[in-house]
Regions:
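Short helix-loop-beta junction
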Residues: 97-105
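N-terminal accessory nucleic-acid engagement/regulatory domains that precede
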Residues: 75-79, 91
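Active-site-facing substrate-recognition patch
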Residues: 1-76, 84-86, 114-147
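Charged helix-capping and loop-helix junction motifs
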Residues: 91-97
Length: 147
């Protein structure tokens, strides 16, 4: 089984991954103003506030043109769906339309639907912590080896 996981991880890591902003969670406090601004833009985009989608769409379209060139007209642009249909629509509908307008990529948004709501990833953490408290945990660290 470990071999399959290793191969899957290798395949995932071999994929091209690009990012425009470096995100630091709020718990990381020692960050510069640029990181705070990036965090705010990400939150604004996810919450569909202040037309943040326009700035992100322009960054995305510019990058896609650089990476794909003329082939862009034959590529379908699809976003990984949000946790609910309402969040998916507020976050991606205008964004995907705008990216398509700016660079000519095919808009795949109309072909994606959220079939059922689920908790957002950050809303899962509390459940895991509660279920962990019902078990016995042995913490293993270097303290066991200090004489």
């Amino acid at each position: 089984m470990a071999r399959i996981i290793d191969d899957n991880i290798k395949r995932q890591l071999s994929k091209r991954m690009d990012f425009f902003l470096k995100y630091f969670p709020v718990r990381v406090r020692n960050v510069g103003e640029d990181a705070v601004a990036a965090r705010q833009l990400i939150w604004d985009f996810k919450d569909a506030r202040d037309n943040a989608f326009e700035k992100v769409a322009q960054m995305t379209a510019k990058h896609l043109i650089q990476v794909c060139g003329e082939k862009i007209k034959d590529i379908v642009f699809v976003c990984v769906p949000a946790s609910t249909q309402a969040k998916n629509e507020s976050r991606y509908k205008a964004f995907c339309n705008r990216v398509s307008e700016l660079c000519g990529i095919i808009n795949g948004y109309p072909h994606i639907s959220v079939s059922g709501d689920r908790l957002a990833i950050h809303e899962h953490r509390h459940d895991k912590e509660k279920s962990l408290s019902k078990t016995q945990v042995i913490e293993f660290d270097e303290a066991y080896f200090k004489g």
